């Protein structure tokens, strides 16, 4: 039987490893070698949806988790995925989007119009003040916002974007899922509305007029 000193030494070492695990590169990966991209919405409980533990050091550590509006592919999502897949031992990417998403609730062209009325020049925006080289082409702002016409279609496009991106290794497993907030059910994305427990996964219930800029088509 080990002494208490030995047990405590191992216990402290485990916390040191936890705190410094990024220093180990691929050998310091998270518990499941997993990177999760999810919508930032508070109605999407990543741990419950995926059956893993992400959020707390006490019971977490299963994945790196990146959340943004919509859980969509963006330049910073690609940057984070590139780092975790190439340098931190990640072997799998899981994308989680959800029904009743706020990214369905408005038309991006109208949203840009509102910003212009507030005096913002959306044709001359520095996306990252520390990287002024990163610029949007004139007229691309509404598309950049990333509003959706259909959650399932967007989820499938996001999956393909990561599968085909040159900065993501080809052996990375990529999958995407839709969380139905109405009944707390996870399912695969589908264009067959008969296979959706809910069919109001489009902007129609919000009264959105006109299609979004063609980012996801």
From Swiss-Prot:
Keyword hit for Lipid metabolism: no
InterPro entries attached to this UniProt entry: Carbonic_anhydrase (IPR001765), Carbonic_anhydrase_sf (IPR036874)
Classification via CDD domains: beta_CA_cladeD
Residues annotated for Zn(2+) binding in this entry: 39, 98, 101
Pathway(s) of this molecule: Sulfur metabolism; hydrogen sulfide biosynthesis
Function: Catalyzes the conversion of carbon disulfide into hydrogen sulfide and carbon dioxide, with carbonyl sulfide as an intermediate. Likely plays a key role in sulfur metabolism that allows A.thiooxidans S1p to grow on carbon disulfide as the main carbon and energy source. Does not show carbonic anhydrase activity (hydration of CO(2) to carbonate).
Keyword Hydrolase recorded: yes
Key words of the record: Hydrolase, Metal-binding, Zinc
Subunit structure, as described in the record: Forms only homooctamers in solution.
A GO biological-process term: hydrogen sulfide biosynthetic process
Bound cofactor: record note: Binds 1 zinc ion per subunit.
Reactions it catalyzes: carbon disulfide + 2 H2O = 2 hydrogen sulfide + CO2 + 2 H(+)
Its EC number(s): 3.13.1.5
Name this protein carries in UniProt: Carbon disulfide hydrolase
PANTHER family: CARBON DISULFIDE HYDROLASE, CARBONIC ANHYDRASE
Source species: Acidithiobacillus thiooxidans
Region listing for Disordered, in residue ranges: 192-217
Pfam families: Pro_CA (PF00484)
Gene Ontology MF terms: carbonate dehydratase activity; hydrolase activity; zinc ion binding
EC class (word): hydrolase
Cofactor(s) named in the record: Zn(2+)
Family: Belongs to the beta-class carbonic anhydrase family.
């Amino acid at each position: 039987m080990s002494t208490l000193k030995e047990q405590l030494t191992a216990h402290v070492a485990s916390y040191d490893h936890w705190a410094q695990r990024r220093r180990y590169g691929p050998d310091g990966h998270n518990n499941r070698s997993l990177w999760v991209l999810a919508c930032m919405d508070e109605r999407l409980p990543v741990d419950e949806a995926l059956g893993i533990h992400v959020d707390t050091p006490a019971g977490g550590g299963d994945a790196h988790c990146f959340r943004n509006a919509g859980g969509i592919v963006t330049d910073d999502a690609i940057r984070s995925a590139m780092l975790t897949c190439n340098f931190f031992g990640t072997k799998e990417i899981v994308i989680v989007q959800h029904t009743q998403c706020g990214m369905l609730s408005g038309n991006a062209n109208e949203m840009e119009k509102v910003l212009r009325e507030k005096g913002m020049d959306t044709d001359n925006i520095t996306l990252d003040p520390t990287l002024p080289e990163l610029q949007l082409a004139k007229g691309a702002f509404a598309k950049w916002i990333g509003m959706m016409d259909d959650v399932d279609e967007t989820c499938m496009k996001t999956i393909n974007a990561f599968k085909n991106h040159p900065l993501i290794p080809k052996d990375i497993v990529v999958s995407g899922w839709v969380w139905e907030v109405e009944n707390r059910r996870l399912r695969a994305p589908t264009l067959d509305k008969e296979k959706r427990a809910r069919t109001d996964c489009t902007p129609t219930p919000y009264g959105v007029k006109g299609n979004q800029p063609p980012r996801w088509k």
